[in-house]
A protein has these predicted regions:
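N-terminal secretory/targeting leader peptides
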Residues: 2-23, 31-129, 144-358
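Signature of the catalytic double-stranded beta-helix
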Residues: 132-144
Length: 358
């Protein structure tokens, strides 16, 4: 027996050591699970406060979180440029300026190279469908591009059209036009058609079209309405240019701090916010297109033969994009094939998919 320690003290210390060893050794020492706490989520998006997205998707989604959590989740909305410009929104969340928010991957070229597959030219007429496809692609392959954040949902967008000041009917009409591009594949599609892609913030497009600095824009119908571009772009070619790759992410530390019993609520409500809220779904898209025509915008559907001329060029863009990425060691063709599979499962046609890759 050690000098100065009684037999009873020795036994007590021994028992404590054995218990600690069993707890640590069997992995029973886990972080304390948090229940019953409340949290306030700072939500950020570049979408304008009065636009379709904020009014019909983000605010209703956050209200649903509040309701489902029985008021234990509250929120603060930061819309438009409140926290930063559009391309900054991934970092706004990842660096903790906000807790959760919407970002556009296409606006940071080269950062999420494979995720650009979601912006290939495809006939997607609802963001609910785009999100189902994006989430499936994230699970299959794209998760590798987003370390360090909690991916809430990943999506492409509703198909973009070309909106112009003057009528466009053929490839020849497009040649030489200056067209605002959102970036990514759309930039290369515009080039492939013989036009000049111009990149500028959406908020600057109205004046640029009004003054003739640009001749048109490639974007989706919701943004035409949100930014009132229907007032300056009175003609649209209804043929898919695809659109941008986007999603909702959550700051990793904010996710860890979220009470454990509220995490399933966040997943349930936000994994497909368009399903949850009914905003920007296929049904809404149909109504939105009627709103566009009610604003006296002429929608021109390309005849099948002319559309194929455009799509042949889009497919060449896909082939080159894949070749460039595979030259860097990325399995781009595999990703494109997977995307086409996920689209076909949901009745979506990828116009830019090279048929020989089936």
């Amino acid at each position: 027996m050690c000098k100065g320690i009684t037999r009873r003290e020795f036994l007590r210390i021994s028992i404590i050591c054995i218990v600690l060893f069993l707890i640590l050794g069997t992995g029973l020492a886990k972080p304390q699970v948090t229940y019953g706490q409340t949290t306030n989520l700072r939500f950020s998006t570049w979408h304008v406060p009065v636009g379709y997205e904020v009014k019909t998707v983000w605010t209703p989604m956050l209200e649903e979180l509040k309701k489902k959590s029985k008021d234990r989740i509250n929120y603060t909305m930061f819309a438009g440029g409140a926290l930063g410009k559009g391309p900054e929104h991934f970092d706004i969340v990842s660096k903790g300026l906000s807790d959760i928010g919407y970002f556009t991957a296409t606006w940071t070229p080269g950062r999420f190279p494979l995720t650009d597959v979601l912006s290939l030219a495809a006939w997607v007429d609802g963001k609910d469908i785009a999100t189902d496809i994006g989430n499936a692609m994230y699970k299959r392959i794209l998760n590798q591009e987003f370390p360090g954040v909690k991916m809430v949902e990943l999506n492409g967008c509703i198909q973009a059209f070309m909106w112009t000041k003057k009528p466009v009917r053929t490839l020849e009409d497009v040649k030489g036009l200056r067209i605002r591009s959102p970036g990514g594949h759309q930039t290369n599609y515009i080039k492939a058609l013989g036009a000049e892609p111009i990149f500028m913030p959406l908020g600057d497009v109205y004046l640029a079209m009004e003054t003739g600095t640009i001749d048109g824009i490639v974007t989706c119908p919701p943004l035409i309405m949100s930014f009132k571009l229907h007032e300056v772009a009175k003609h649209a070619v209804v043929t898919t240019f695809g659109c941008v790759s986007e999603g909702v992410i959550m700051n990793q530390d904010s996710w860890k701090k979220t009470p454990d019993d509220l995490k399933p609520v966040v997943d349930e409500v936000c994994h497909n916010p368009f399903h949850t809220t009914g905003g920007l779904t296929r049904d809404v898209y149909k109504k939105m297109m009627k709103e566009v025509t009610d604003k006296k915008v002429e929608l021109y559907n390309l005849p099948a033969k002319e559309a194929e001329r455009w799509y042949d060029r889009f497919r060449d863009v896909t082939r080159k994009w894949v070749a460039d990425l595979e030259g860097k060691g990325l399995k781009a063709k595999e990703v494109v094939r997977a995307y086409n599979e996920e689209c076909e499962k949901r009745g979506v046609k990828v116009a830019a998919f090279p048929p020989e890759w089936k």
